């Protein structure tokens, strides 16, 4: 039976994602906190937090799940030509806090953000402990785009992206895909499907299939140097 669980501040195991509600799609639990152990447990089990500043903490595992296969993200010919002409520089884990702040800025036609100060503090802690990572796009010394997410074994869980110049976030996505391919990652979790993700080649798969893939990949080791601070040279041929 589908049911909504209420979490307290004592650390406890999450309920099975299969118990998540269908309306709203994927809502599994309410409450708890954003301590690193709980967040890592959530992502390890295919669950993520998503809530507005005036809501309690809400935990989700939607069905279907939006995913990318590294190597299958669509980078159009016109975008490749555009990016080749840009003097942009792309880095990994150079400005995580600034990327989160950029992602937290309200979007057009939105009055607020789900990336609250509480969320930012929690994910900065995950970054400091080597679990959360960022891709930055620079024009000179100005940060013009980027994305961030978590690495769980050979799975990258994308959280959010932003841009201050046209196509800068797409440059970050292209760099992420290139890097993950080189480092042997097998899956990118994009959480909830939308038209933008679909245009980039995201696939909607059943939650049970996502959980199966996650369980196969989450404990696989990756090169310790994967997330050292570095520059990425886009290969756009």
From Swiss-Prot:
It catalyses: N-terminal L-lysyl-[protein] + L-leucyl-tRNA(Leu) = N-terminal L-leucyl-L-lysyl-[protein] + tRNA(Leu) + H(+); N-terminal L-arginyl-[protein] + L-leucyl-tRNA(Leu) = N-terminal L-leucyl-L-arginyl-[protein] + tRNA(Leu) + H(+); L-phenylalanyl-tRNA(Phe) + an N-terminal L-alpha-aminoacyl-[protein] = an N-terminal L-phenylalanyl-L-alpha-aminoacyl-[protein] + tRNA(Phe). This is Leucyl/phenylalanyl-tRNA--protein transferase. It comes from Shewanella baltica (strain OS223). GO terms for cellular component: cytoplasm. Signal peptide: none annotated. Pfam families: Leu_Phe_trans. Keywords: Acyltransferase, Cytoplasm, Transferase. It is found in: Cytoplasm. NCBIfam families: aat. GO terms for biological process: protein catabolic process. Gene3D superfamilies: Leucyl/phenylalanyl-tRNA-protein transferase, C-terminal domain, Leucyl/phenylalanyl-tRNA-protein transferase, N-terminal domain.
């Amino acid at each position: 039976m589908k049911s909504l669980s209420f979490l307290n501040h004592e650390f406890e195991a999450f309920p099975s994602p299969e118990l998540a509600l269908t309306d709203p799609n994927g809502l599994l639990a309410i409450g708890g906190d954003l301590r690193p152990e709980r967040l890592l447990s959530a992502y390890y089990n295919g669950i993520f937090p998503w809530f507005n500043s005036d809501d309690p903490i809400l935990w989700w595992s939607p069905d279907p799940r939006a995913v990318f296969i590294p190597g299958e993200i669509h980078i159009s010919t016109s975008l490749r030509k555009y990016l080749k002409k840009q003097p942009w520089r792309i880095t990994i884990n150079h400005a995580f806090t600034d990327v989160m702040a950029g992602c937290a800025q309200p979007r057009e036609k939105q009055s607020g953000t789900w990336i609250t100060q509480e969320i930012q503090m929690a994910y900065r802690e995950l970054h400091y402990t080597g679990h959360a990572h960022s891709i930055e796009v620079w024009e000179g010394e100005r940060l013009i785009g980027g994305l961030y997410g978590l690495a769980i074994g050979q799975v990258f869980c994308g959280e959010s992206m932003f841009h201050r110049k046209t196509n800068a976030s797409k440059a970050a996505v292209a760099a992420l895909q290139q890097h993950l391919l080189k480092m042997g990652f097998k899956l990118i979790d994009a959480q909830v499907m939308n038209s933008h993700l679909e245009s980039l080649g995201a696939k909607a798969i059943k939650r049970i299939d996502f959980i199966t893939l996650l369980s196969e990949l989450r404990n696989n080791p990756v090169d310790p140097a994967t997330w050292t601070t570095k520059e990425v040279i886009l290969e756009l041929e």
